[in-house]
């Protein structure tokens, strides 16, 4: 990802890739590991302002870095150890966590340290690697969100067709394809990335040196289309159809409940006719309350009489408050999952929209972008793009009940409590007498064994 190439100070003049964007008398304030230098006239900024801005920037970087690394490592561990969370959707969320962790570990330190030191000291290899890994991470995150949206659409709106290919092995193949496609798409970054001298005598910067301004513009527009607009349209359409299907499913269940109540009260005469047809692409669950991560509905196969009798005996009865039926509970669970995924998508695009816009603006009007975005705006855009790596763990913790439970179970497994030692009876104490419940259980067992007299 071409991160913050807006305020670059390079030797040379003109409108080419090496053109200087700093005015005469400008002072070098910071340099980014991605090759960005911010230059502003010293008369506009005092030493106290620069120190305060630097302290705020370092603090925010540290907080975002720790939250990104800790949160995504926790996601990877929990999804890897919990068998209940090994679903198709969570497989894509696991890939998303890996890409976010890659963005935090491989890019953030090499962006902050050059800002503090005023030069890029890591060499050409690290410069090319950081630029490449940053682009791969953003591309994988975008494609993973698209894959999740399409998978949810197939599971909820086309459940019969989705059951043929909706498996973890198919999800693994899709994940591998997203990483390979992202790796091929970002090949131009290491090819056209280099370390070159900056404004100072010994200052270096990691920059993209495109062959021409037209190539840079074409590349910016291509990334804007492939990684922002097209995925955004696909996800908007998919989640719109999903919301419509869930709404129709809830309406269908409400109509079924009202018709059942009317029949039980004798409102309908002449026998029980066929109920309302389910919405298009929907089906009834096979039974049981749905989990929070249901992957769709299953086809209800015909059962034998013994199975039906056993189901009638063991079926859960609604509570006194009139709890939701299994089908309604499954739809509500799907609604919660879709709501969580929508929050993830919205936050991702909110974090990256300013950067895509800034890069496209710079590709067509570098001097205007520099004048408008120098200083605090570009720092905010920078931090906002990196904040996308730490928002997903927060969303999971606040909106995913099973993930919270799995986190607690994982922590309990890693830090088990020592078992409490039972007090030993003293030698002069009598042995414990059986309780009333034990006697009742013993009497019931004896009577059941002997049978009727």
UniProtKB/Swiss-Prot annotation:
Major localization listed first in the record, in broad terms: membrane
Superkingdom to which the source organism belongs: Eukaryota
Gene3D superfamilies recorded: Rhodopsin 7-helix transmembrane proteins (1.20.1070.10)
Localization of this protein: Cell membrane
Membrane-crossing residue ranges in chain numbering: 58-79, 88-109, 132-150, 171-189, 221-243, 340-361, 380-400
Extracellular-side positions: 1-57, 110-131, 190-220, 362-379
One CC-aspect GO term: intracellular membrane-bounded organelle
UniProt-annotated stretches for the region Disordered: 258-286, 422-453
One family name in Pfam for this protein: 7tm_1
Residues lipid-modified (S-palmitoyl cysteine): 414
Compositional bias (Polar residues): 435-453
Protein's membrane topology: Multi-pass membrane protein
Residues in the Cytoplasmic compartment per record: 80-87, 151-170, 244-339, 401-453
Molecular functions (GO terms): cholecystokinin receptor activity; gastrin receptor activity; peptide hormone binding; type B gastrin/cholecystokinin receptor binding
Tagged with keyword Repeat: no
GO biological process, one term: positive regulation of cytosolic calcium ion concentration
Keywords linked to the UniProt accession: Cell membrane, Disulfide bond, G-protein coupled receptor, Glycoprotein, Lipoprotein, Membrane, Palmitate, Receptor, Transducer, Transmembrane, Transmembrane helix
UniProt-annotated glycosylation sites, renumbered to this chain: 7, 30, 36
Tissue specificity as recorded in UniProt: Parietal cells, pancreas, brain and various neoplastic tissues.
Cysteine-cysteine disulfides: 127-206
Family membership: Belongs to the G-protein coupled receptor 1 family.
PANTHER family with a match to the protein in the record: G-PROTEIN COUPLED RECEPTOR, GASTRIN_CHOLECYSTOKININ TYPE B RECEPTOR
Function: Receptor for gastrin and cholecystokinin. The CCK-B receptors occur throughout the central nervous system where they modulate anxiety, analgesia, arousal, and neuroleptic activity. This receptor mediates its action by association with G proteins that activate a phosphatidylinositol-calcium second messenger system.
The protein, known as: Gastrin/cholecystokinin type B receptor
């Amino acid at each position: 990802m071409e991160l913050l190439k807006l305020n670059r100070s390079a030797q040379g003049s003109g409108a080419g890739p090496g053109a200087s964007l700093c005015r005469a008398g400008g002072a070098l304030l910071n340099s980014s590991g991605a090759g960005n230098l911010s230059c502003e006239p010293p008369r506009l900024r005092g030493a106290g302002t620069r120190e305060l801005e630097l302290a705020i920037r370092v603090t925010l970087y540290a907080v975002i870095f720790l939250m990104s690394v800790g949160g995504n490592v926790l996601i990877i561990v929990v999804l890897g150890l919990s068998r209940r969370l090994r679903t198709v959707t969570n497989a894509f969320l696991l890939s998303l966590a890996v890409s976010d962790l890659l963005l935090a570990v491989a890019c953030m330190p090499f962006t902050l340290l050059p800002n503090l030191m005023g030069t890029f000291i890591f060499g050409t290899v690290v410069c090319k690697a950081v630029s490449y890994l940053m682009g791969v991470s953003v591309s994988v995150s975008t494609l993973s969100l698209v894959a999740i949206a399409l998978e949810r659409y197939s599971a909820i709106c086309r459940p019969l067709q989705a059951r043929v290919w909706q498996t973890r092995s198919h999800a693994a193949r899709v994940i591998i394809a997203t990483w390979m496609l992202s790796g091929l798409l970002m090949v131009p970054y290491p090819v056209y990335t280099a370390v070159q001298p900056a404004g100072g005598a010994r200052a270096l910067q990691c920059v993209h040196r495109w062959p021409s301004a037209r190539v840079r513009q074409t590349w910016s527009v291509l990334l804007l289309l492939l990684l922002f607009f097209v995925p955004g349209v696909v996800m908007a359409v998919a989640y719109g159809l999903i919301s419509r299907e869930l709404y129709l499913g809830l309406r269908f269940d409400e109509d079924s409940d009202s018709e059942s109540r009317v029949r039980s009260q004798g409102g309908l005469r002449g026998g029980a006719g066929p109920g309302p047809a389910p919405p298009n692409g929907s089906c009834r669950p096979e039974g049981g309350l749905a989990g929070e991560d249901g992957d769709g509905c299953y086809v209800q196969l015909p059962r034998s009489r013994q199975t039906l009798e056993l189901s009638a005996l063991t079926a859960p009865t609604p509570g006194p408050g009139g709890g939701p039926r299994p089908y309604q509970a499954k739809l509500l669970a799907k609604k919660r999952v879709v709501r969580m995924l929508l929050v993830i998508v919205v936050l991702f695009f909110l974090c990256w929209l300013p950067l895509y816009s800034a890069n496209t603006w710079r590709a067509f009007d570098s001097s205007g972008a520099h004048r408008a975005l120098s200083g605090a705006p570009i720092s905010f855009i920078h931090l906002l793009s990196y904040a996308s790596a730490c928002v997903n763990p927060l969303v999971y913790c606040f909106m995913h009940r099973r993930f919270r439970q799995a986190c607690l179970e994982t922590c309990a497994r890693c830090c088990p409590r020592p078992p409490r030692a039972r007090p030993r009876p003293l030698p002069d104490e009598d042995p414990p007498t059986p309780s009333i419940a034990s006697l009742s259980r013993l009497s019931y067992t004896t009577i059941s064994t002997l049978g009727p007299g």
